[in-house]
Structure formats: C-alpha cells, structure tokens
A protein has these predicted regions:
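Amphipathic cytosolic juxtamembrane alpha-helices at the membrane-cytosol interface
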Residues: 2-7, 58, 88-91, 140-142, ...
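C-terminal transmembrane helix and the adjacent membrane-cytosol boundary/short C-terminal tail
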Residues: 3-13, 23, 27, 160-175, ...
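Interhelical loop and adjacent transmembrane-helix boundary motif
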Residues: 4, 45-52, 212, 216-266
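Cytoplasmic-entry segments and transmembrane alpha-helices of multi-pass inner-membrane transporters
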Residues: 9-10, 78-115, 171-172, 185, ...
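Short membrane-interfacial helix/loop motifs at transmembrane-helix boundaries
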Residues: 11, 15-54, 115-119, 220, ...
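Transmembrane alpha-helices
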Residues: 12-21, 95, 99, 149, ...
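Membrane-interfacial helix termini and adjacent extracytoplasmic/periplasmic loops
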Residues: 42, 109-148, 182, 218-222
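Transmembrane alpha-helix signature in integral membrane proteins
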Residues: 51-84
Length: 274
C-alpha cells in the first residue's frame, strides 16, 4: 500500500494530540508565564525556589526514588520467576498482575487506607492476637507502600518482555563456555534486559514523582508532595498562574529524567554494564 495514500489515517491521532496534549500544554504555559493581570512574568516559575516548594519537590523525588528502587528489586526476581514458568502458566500469572489495574486507581488506594488506618484491618488483627497497634497511616512509609502497590505492574511487564527476548540458546552457550550462574546473569541476562529495566524505571518514577492522590489518602495533611502543592494551587488557592508555573518546572524535571534514562538505555543496550 502506498504510504502517501495512507497518511490520512494519522489524521484522527493528530487531532486527538492537538486537542488533548498540545493545546492544554500551551494553556499551562500561558498561565505559568503570566500573572493574574495577563502580563508576562517568570515569578511563577521562580517560585519553585521557595523553601516550601523546594521541600515538597525534594520529598517527592526522595519517595519516588525509594518506590522505584523497591519496585525494581521486587519486579526483576519476579519477572525471572515468571519467565521460568511453563508457557501455559505464564499467561495466567501475567493476567493476575494486570487484573488489579482493571480496578479504579482511586478505589485501590482507598482500600489501602482502610487497611492501614488506626482502626483498620491490620491493626484490628494485631489487637486480636494481643499485639500493640502500629502507626502506619499518614506516614512516608504508607505513601511508598501505595506507590509500590499501584505502580509495580509497570515495572514487572517491561522487564518480563525484555527477559523473554533473551534466547535460552544464548544462556546455554554462556554456560557451555564455562560461565557460572552469577557470571551468566551479570554478563548476559542483565545487560540484555537493560532496556526493559530503563523503561520500567521511567514508567514508575514519573507517576510516583507527580502523584497527589496517594499522598492525599495515605499521607494526609502531614506530608505534602509537589503534586499536592500544585493541586492545592489550582483547587484551594485558585491561583492557576502559580500552579501552572510550578507545573512547568516539574515538567522540565520529568523531561530531564526521561532524557537521562534514554541516554543510559542507548549506551547500555546489548552491552555489558561494567
């Protein structure tokens, strides 16, 4: 089929991108670079340098990194186990990981709120066996737990997809040449699955950095992430200009982190890590 005759098929996608991606970004940029009078200003962007905002973004980066590392440490062994299963069982196991994602994100987080609160299910069980209740809700640990639970599938699936592309013949050849299990993993498996790891890290880190629902429900008012600050500027303070300015800075941070991940992926694909 002639490519020139099929270009029109991209028309709906272009319209969709223009309406729901490009135009909203332009609106955010206009609000972020103007004040309430409509005059040009960079004060909304520079406001990120204020102590309260720096504290929020630093806390966001910290918790996002912790959540991403935990997801990676859980997901990689899990993906290895899934790959080692028989083909008939593998599809069912993948289905079990995807199944929770069919439930609404908000409902999944509220469920964890019910489990972790002072009178929740976990503390009720602890009391039933004579143990002291734990202070789990409204803590940084609760937020990290919520992030890991919600975003873990986004780490497992890319790593698993990378693992199934590693041929058994390649691994067997390494063993035939005298490599033990550890050497085979670090010299063959890990380098070949680096693209999947990078993809998973990006897919977990970015939503963890920008989330505000998880921190609202599991962190309460005690812990404020940059997503909460931006959300409050739009909804509570009704200052769309400041909220948009902070969003622009956060967008630059995200784009920078994705660029770094892409650079690592390009250098690491198909090569050894050391």
């Amino acid at each position: 089929m002639n490519p020139k005759k099929t270009r029109w098929l991209s028309g709906p996608y272009i319209v969709w991108m223009a309406l729901f991606v490009i135009i909203p970004l332009i609106i955010v940029a206009v609000y972020g670079l103007t004040n309430m009078d409509g005059s040009f200003t960079v004060q909304n962007v520079l406001a990120m340098g204020q102590q309260v905002h720096m504290k929020a973004i630093w806390m966001s980066v910290q918790l996002a990194l912790i959540s991403t590392i935990i997801c990676l440490l859980i997901a990689y062994p899990l993906a290895l186990i899934i790959r080692a299963l028989k083909i008939k069982s593998t599809g069912f196991v993948i289905f079990l990981f995807i199944l929770p994602m069919w439930m609404n994100f908000l409902l999944r987080t509220i469920a964890w709120q019910s489990l972790l609160e002072k009178t929740g299910v976990i503390n009720s069980l602890l009391k039933a066996v004579g143990l002291s209740p734990l202070n789990m809700i409204n803590t940084e640990g609760a937020i990290v737990l919520g992030m890991v639970y919600n975003f873990l599938p986004f780490m497992v699936l890319p790593i698993y997809n990378a693992l199934i592309k590693v041929s058994d013949d390649t691994l067997n050849a390494a063993r035939d040449l005298g490599a033990n299990g550890v050497q085979t993993f670090f010299k063959i498996t890990l380098p070949l699955t680096t693209p999947g790891m990078i993809s998973g890290i990006t897919m977990v880190f970015v939503p963890s950095l920008t989330t505000f629902v998880i921190s609202d429900l599991l962190g309460g008012a005690k812990i404020s992430l940059i997503g909460n600050v931006i959300e409050q500027e739009f909804t509570t303070a009704n200052d769309w200009n400041l909220g948009s300015g902070l969003s622009l800075v956060l967008m630059v941070v995200i784009i920078g982190s994705m660029a770094i991940m892409s650079g690592i992926d390009k250098r690491g694909e198909g090569t050894t890590l050391w």
